[in-house]
Amino acid sequence: MEPTILLLLALLVGFLLLLVRGHPKSRGNFPPGPRPLPLLGNLLQLDRGGLLNSFMQLREKYGDVFTVHLGPRPVVMLCGTDTIKEALVGQAEDFSGRGTIAVIEPIFKEYGVIFANGERWKALRRFSLATMRDFGMGKRSVEERIQEEAQCLVEELRKSQGAPLDPTFLFQCITANIICSIVFGERFDYTDRQFLRLLELFYRTFSLLSSFSSQVFEFFSGFLKYFPGAHRQISKNLQEILDYIGHIVEKHRATLDPSAPRDFIDTYLLRMEKEKSNHHTEFHHENLMISLLSLFFAGTETSSTTLRYGFLLMLKYPHVAEKVQKEIDQVIGSHRLPTLDDRSKMPYTDAVIHEIQRFSDLVPIGVPHRVTKDTMFRGYLLPKNTEVYPILSSALHDPQYFDHPDSFNPEHFLDANGALKKSEAFMPFSTGKRICLGEGIARNELFLFFTTILQNFSVSSHLAPKDIDLTPKESGIGKIPPTYQICFSAR
């Protein structure tokens, strides 16, 4: 008999056995949710619009805490600002584990600073925060690196002479170069072939991660991993990036000066050498490689995509861009570079950047957590290792905190006196112990890049503002803005 037929028969028999025996009751007292089918879980409740739409519909029926079965595994959803804060901040240690994203699990395997757990995660996070802080405050601060990159961008945009262009590539270049300078110790020219290949791989991978097929993969990863699909291309892309990172690491090994570490890699290699006699150390090659991949990927695509959304919104709402430019002219003028010290004197611009991050809602579902022990939460018992999804979109669009949550309105972050107003619901970087470790760098990038561009250029489109579409191209793990053309005209 053909192997394919045998496989199908085995699957059919297994499915029938599950139907006969029924779905086994999970240990613990889970929050309510739709009744799962054997093997399928809640697939039939999945909206074609994606997981986020599905979860929001289920929230209306089951409340702010509910359970969804992604295939056979139960996952608890947390919705609303107060619920997310109560879990990730109020019970921070209990909810500090990292869950699994099945489509990238074959590459990350719980290594690296983002997807590690337990003592491994704590050691890598402490090291990463300290190292990035040291290289951000050393001879060349992060501020200086961003200012330098912003001026490179200005020169590139001047070359366009106001002709329409897609900003995706240039925004990728500038954000990637900041993380490259901290992690690799160098920036790349915008024409460097290897650099261009890396940016292409990051862009394609982020798009695939946000696709509907990747969302379906979360339900049936144990089965679908044996078949062709987006998951295989994602693994192939990430492996190619790892191969390049491996080459960079070997170059660092060959030129390492213990008395003068140049960057994150050098500092990690020195720590590896220091702990080589410790058989239980977490500072080994695998954690280095996956940490570098994590930092590079998170530090490039998220900030560049936020900038893309930001300038699309400036085309849609030109009066906002004009008001930002007025504040830039008053505070900075046209003859010096914007600095981070300017931010406190520019509440409207700061509010606009906050609103761009809130409205663009870049990682709507949030990177999954898991509970580190049996945990009581709002009367429910979540067994150790239960996966938890903080639906960040439900906080960023929380009507209890934002008057018009589905509209772009910088007034959400301004008080009656025009000063910047903080909001508990503002969590684009998540919150709690797993908050994005690059938050500070990302905030600095957004402010300096945004103000430098609008200091030097006015932006326009061949489309009327009313015709500009803000609908995301993909909306899964990440929201991908639609492609668009923009004109940068020198002021």
UniProtKB/Swiss-Prot annotation:
CDD domains the record matches: CYP2B (cd20672)
Cofactors: heme
An MF annotation (GO) of this entry: steroid hydroxylase activity
GO cellular component, one term: intracellular membrane-bounded organelle
Record keyword S-adenosyl-L-methionine present: no
Pfam families the UniProt entry points to: p450 (PF00067)
UniProt modification remark: Phosphorylation is accompanied by a decrease in enzyme activity.
Keywords linked to the UniProt accession: Endoplasmic reticulum, Heme, Iron, Membrane, Metal-binding, Microsome, Mitochondrion, Mitochondrion inner membrane, Monooxygenase, Oxidoreductase, Phosphoprotein
InterPro entries listed in its UniProt record: Cyt_P450 (IPR001128), Cyt_P450_CS (IPR017972), Cyt_P450_E_grp-I (IPR002401), Cyt_P450_E_grp-I_CYP2B-like (IPR008068), Cyt_P450_sf (IPR036396), Cytochrome_P450_fam2 (IPR050182)
Induction trigger: By phenobarbital.
Location relative to the cell: Endoplasmic reticulum membrane; Microsome membrane; Mitochondrion inner membrane
Reaction(s) this enzyme catalyzes, per UniProt: an organic molecule + reduced [NADPH--hemoprotein reductase] + O2 = an alcohol + oxidized [NADPH--hemoprotein reductase] + H2O + H(+)
Known role: Cytochromes P450 are a group of heme-thiolate monooxygenases. In liver microsomes, this enzyme is involved in an NADPH-dependent electron transport pathway. It oxidizes a variety of structurally unrelated compounds, including steroids, fatty acids, and xenobiotics.
Family of the protein in this entry: Belongs to the cytochrome P450 family.
Subunit structure and binding partners: Interacts with chaperones HSP70 and HSP90; this interaction is required for initial targeting to mitochondria.
Protein name: Cytochrome P450 2B1
Organism for this UniProt entry: Rattus norvegicus (Rat)
